[in-house]
């Protein structure tokens, strides 16, 4: 049987949003203000964020990810009948400080030790 000699891992690359960072944590922070629509807003926000990224790429109408994030939130809020500019601002600010998933710190420490 052939022995496989693997080199030590020197670099690892991750998709940050949705893999390391919980994209729904922004809406969770403002659950009290979003009320029963919190989950729907968060899910639609993420769905539109991905769809807008794909569509703009296909149409070669590139904008930065932050613009996509804002446009997607606007759609999600409007679709849920929410017209609150301060809530919009606070949700976008929360997106700058997304929580990581609980297992991420330990996993990254373990990978660092490899």
PLM regions: where:
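A structural signal for alpha-helical segments
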Residues: 4, 60-64, 99
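A metal-dependent, Asp-based hydrolase signature
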Residues: 33, 39, 53-89
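A broad detector of the eukaryotic-type serine/threonine protein kinase catalytic domain
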Residues: 50-54, 96
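Residues in soluble alpha-helical coiled-coils and helical-bundle/repeat scaffolds
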Residues: 22, 36, 82, 96-99
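Active-site neighborhood of HAD-like aspartate-dependent phosphohydrolases
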Residues: 2-50
